Design a protein with these regions (language model features):
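Chalcogenol-based redox active-site neighborhoods
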Residues: 1-134
């Protein structure tokens, strides 16, 4: 199922990129969005998560953690390249290209109003909600 930002025109969007389903930090981040979903809905804000995982992986992740928002699959990295979130990482002494945890706030007209790079999960949701009300 294809999604485009124009599908959400007229609504604010939180587009968050995360490295991988079912890893500790990514799971904590998804659960933090889940737990704050009413605050986002109260402001008519759509949450979209995106990673390089498959649709099947996302479906299991959503079911396992009861996530009330859409996770998008970017297995060919097209969207990751557009948002420049693929960065070189050092994983166990080996260099690899992976998603840098990033969040983009997008306004009702489809313009990016705020970019968070190298996101730390703790306090991130509160930061987003504060910036969405400005």
């Amino acid at each position: 199922n294809q999604h485009t930002l124009s599908d959400y025109r007229g609504r604010k969007v939180v587009l968050y990129f995360y490295p991988r389903d079912n890893t500790p930090a990514c799971t904590n981040q998804a659960k933090a969005f889940r737990d704050a979903i009413e605050s986002f809905h109260a402001q008519d804000i759509v949450i979209l998560g995106i990673s390089r995982d498959t649709v099947a992986s996302h479906e299991k992740f959503v079911t396992k953690h009861d996530l009330p928002f859409i996770l998008l699959s970017d297995t060919d990295e097209t969207v990751c390249h557009l948002y420049d979130v693929l960065k070189e990482k050092n994983m166990y002494g080996k260099k690899a290209i992976g998603i840098e945890r990033s969040t983009f706030l997008i306004d009702e007209e489809g313009f990016i109003t705020k970019i968070y790079r190298k996101v730390k999960v703790a306090g991130h949701i509160e930061d987003i909600l504060e910036n969405c009300t400005l």
